[in-house]
Amino acid sequence: MTDAIVKGLSTFQQVLVWIINLFWLYQFIISITSLIKFKEKPMLTDKKHRFIIALPANNEENVIGNLIKSLKMQDYDKSLFDIYVIADNCTDNTAEVARENGVIVYERFDETKKTKGYALNWFLDKMKDKKDDYDALLVFDADNVVDKNFLNVMNKKLCQGEVLVQGYRDIKNPTDTWVSGGYAIFYWTMNRLYHLARYNMGLSPLINGTAFMVKWDLLIDEGWNTKTLTEDIEFALINISKGVKLGWAKDAIVYDEQPLTFKESWKQRERWSVRTYSMC
């Protein structure tokens, strides 16, 4: 009996090792394609598209102004994009700061529905009368700073026929502490060896919470009907299941602020893990 148990455990261990090895072999093969420079997709049109930019914000009075200023400095025709701040359950001066920076503000108060997914769905419902006014939606987190060429790059992606595209999430504070430095290494690795690699292979990367574009007609009729707390991943998977191929824009750069202390990082990672588990 004991020999049978030992043999069973040994077999289980070997199977587990093979599964892990196959997983890492799969990751290695995909990551190799990140080193290959592929020919760009052909331009299907040379249109200058019109963008609606949504900035969901909950008590972000200290950072929202910097984001708006970076968007207003875009090297893109200013008449072709509108900036909306969704002040979501704010108890500070986020809405006032946004208005002072000259953008349109929508204030939302619903203590039972607090996530970004609910805020985006609520906002899109308000925008249904603007169905024909825009070509694509861009979404950013309130603590971001956006590279001046972001809209030009996303416009090019639309001209190439892309409909759902993730931008390059870089780090605003990589040298502040060892924690933020660790985040920087993580995102740099993911950007190169996951997002770019999968895109080069014709596979879909995932939406990463901020700095992404969705073609307007893909979104405006159905809204942002996600049910979980990881609304970005859920939205990506819903569209992948419908046959939508997600795109990757390595030159559409946004700078994102990361935690400085281990305690802040632990809380964030714990929150992300719980939210990801809720999708299972």
Label each PLM-derived region with a short phrase.
Residues 107-130, 148-228, 266, 270-280:
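Long helical/loop segments within the catalytic core of UDP-sugar-dependent glycosyltransferases
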Residues 65, 92-99, 149:
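Acidic helix N-cap motif at the loop->helix transition within catalytic regions
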Residues 131-145:
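Short beta-strand-to-loop acidic/aromatic patch adjacent to the donor-nucleotide binding site
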Residues 49-52, 82, 234:
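Cell-envelope/extracellular polymer assembly enzymes that use nucleotide-activated donors
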Residues 1-47:
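N-terminal membrane-anchoring/stem segments of glycan-assembly enzymes
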Residues 141-145, 225, 239:
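The conserved acidic donor/metal-binding loop of glycosyltransferases
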Residues 69-80:
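Short, acidic, metal-binding catalytic loop of nucleotide-sugar glycosyltransferases
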